[in-house]
Amino acid sequence: MPIFVNTVYCKNILALYTTKKFKTIIEAIGGNIIVNSTILKKLSPYFRTHLRQKYTKNKDPVTRVCLDLDIHSLTSIVIYSYTGKVYIDSHNVVNLLRASILTSVEFIIYTCINFILRDFRKEYCIECYMMGIEYGLSNLLCHTKDFITKHFLELEDDIIDNFDYLSMKLILESDELNVPDEDYVVDFVIKWYMRRRNRLGNLLLLIKNVIRSNYLSPRGIHNVKWILDCNIIFHCDKQPRKSYKYPFIEYPMNMDQIIDIFHMCTSTHVGEVVYLIGGWMNNEIHNNAIAVNYISNNWIPIPPMNSPRLYASGIPANNKLYVVGGLPNPTSVERWFHGDAAWVNMPSLLKPRCNPAVASINNVIYVMGGHSETDTTTEYLLPNHDQWQFGPSTYYPHYKSCALVFGRRLFLVGRNAEFYCESSNTWTLIDDPIYPRDNPELIIVDNKLLLIGGFYRGSYIDTIEVYNNRTYSWNIWDGMEW
């Protein structure tokens, strides 16, 4: 066990032994100890006050006092008072620091703090942080605050169980707070409020003081509006936190510039939020992702995927965002959504696929094409299942087709066209598009199914086609009522 010596105190300690000795029995937490009260009274004002003998006619040669200190820490302080030496290790340092603060023994206070800072450990960072706030120990507070913000996800439960409003605010307002996105902070504050049963006023103050609303998803904004019971959220112009700040995005940067960075990315959308996933950046495939809200014209952070991806496909289902296939791992699948700490790897596809057509009906994910120009297989993943299964084969190969659910049917369109009916578990042929296409898109406008874009034999197809539900055929759409 390391020994620390106060050399100045040691020089003066001999003089204390020449004074009259008074024995005192101290009843502490966990045991008793007999001390020379004369020496202890010289150690600090705390002991001078608490060991003062009551003046009575019949003085007891041995007095008794009760102190709210644990016996082990008190013993260390008593030994220091006799010898000028204190024994400190990782097992006793926190309790000894608290006891030395209560007893105003400055040498032990600063020795304990220096020991903690040199040999800092996660297991006592929460208690040290709270002592830093309670007793105004600035160097201990700064060090523990930095550690907690960087290891926030690991310490989340301990923070919820122990922190009050002030302790929480100092952490959550930090630029260094290590969170995957701002929705995570909103979810955490709600969780803290529910578990600790804090006053509603504390919750409202935290939300207003620490949340960076300009980086919230619609889901996060909805939660904040629910908490504040308002229709319009407060404006915030703070910079993004360092943990979700993109190194390749300069601030400020408009949405068009951000979209240009995500070259050859996968895209999908949920409501007004478009998700840009993977692609080609700096001459390599990357694992970055970002969300763009085209209504509020702001970007929303997304943590990096577990795998880099090019020519993947994305689909929202089960309140999550799924990314399927693509290079360099064409069978891999992962999922995430706002507020999640990280992407989660999902069961692998049965066949490798690039740019497959994907769609979801009743939270069942269907994957078609993307394997080869002759492949007609389909796969599906049921909610909460851990394995993909083959579904009914399509009539045509759909190597570069697209898919969309319209009118409770899953349409699969490219050079050929057909739709899937979940209730009958069958595919039905419909007329091929007037202009066959590779990599087109299906969209719904005014309750009409439109086929747009795509290439055929190296040429871009600029003609838009609209589906006729009565004749199972396609017509040229000119933007007028049809």
Swiss-Prot record:
Residue ranges occupied by any BACK domain in the UniProt entry: 125-222
Purpose of the protein: Might have a role in the suppression of host immune response.
Gene name tied to this protein: OPG047
Record's keyword terms, sorted: Kelch repeat, Repeat
Spans of repeat Kelch: 273-319, 320-363, 365-408, 410-447, 448-482
Induction: Expressed in the early phase of the viral replicative cycle.
Cystine crosslinks: none
Family (UniProt): Belongs to the orthopoxvirus OPG047 family.
Protein name as catalogued: Immune evasion protein OPG047
One Pfam match: BACK
PANTHER family in the record: KELCH PROTEIN, RING FINGER DOMAIN AND KELCH REPEAT-CONTAINING PROTEIN DDB_G0271372
InterPro entries given in the database record: BACK, BTB/POZ_dom, Kelch-typ_b-propeller, Kelch_1, SKP1/BTB/POZ_sf
Domain (BTB): residue spans on this chain: 20-90
